[in-house]
């Protein structure tokens, strides 16, 4: 994963051992900014529950190895997954002592393509229960267009 920091005009690679670190000083981690590797976790259905009017599955995810626990920075998570469209509305993260340390709530989604069933979270909120801090991320403008692969290079991102 790479991140471009426009204020510094620098591109930085985020290696796997940095997934658990804070994303730009926020309560989100670098791992929270990407889709997780599905093979990195084992899954268990913990139940079904309504959440804010959405009928959801409660899915517990556990990293399949201690190396992956260290990489992601938590021992397990529980997510409320919408039964209709499989969007994740809320996730609780538990530390290595089994204590809840972070909650992420996905408040709004934008459908990216008609008929494709692809969505993007456009409003998310992270609450850190260990330090009582929170962060909110809102993406006001989201557009999906055809993009040349050349845009996804360090040289292109850092051009003047």
What are these language model-derived features?
Residues 33-46:
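A short, amphipathic edge element
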Residues 1-5:
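N-terminal mature ectodomain segment of secretory-pathway/periplasmic proteins
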Residues 12-14, 19-36, 52-154:
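Gly/Pro-enriched, hydrophobic low-complexity segments
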Residues 159-160:
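Short, solvent-exposed mixed-charge patches
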């Amino acid at each position: 994963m790479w991140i471009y920091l426009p204020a510094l005009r620098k591109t930085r690679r985020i290696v796997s051992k940095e997934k658990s670190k804070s994303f730009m000083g926020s309560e989100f981690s670098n791992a929270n900014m990407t889709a997780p590797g599905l093979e990195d976790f084992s899954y268990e259905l913990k139940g079904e529950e309504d959440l804010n009017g959405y009928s959801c599955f409660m899915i517990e995810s556990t990293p399949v190895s201690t190396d992956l626990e260290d990489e992601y920075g938590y021992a397990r998570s529980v997510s409320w997954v919408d039964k209709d469209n499989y969007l994740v509305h809320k996730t609780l993260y538990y530390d290595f002592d089994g204590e809840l340390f972070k909650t992420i709530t996905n408040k709004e989604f934008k459908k990216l393509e008609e008929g494709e069933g692809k969505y993007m979270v456009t409003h998310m909120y992270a609450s850190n229960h260990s330090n009582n801090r929170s962060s909110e991320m809102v993406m006001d403008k989201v557009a999906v267009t055809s993009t040349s692969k050349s845009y996804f290079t360090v040289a292109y991102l850092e051009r003047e």
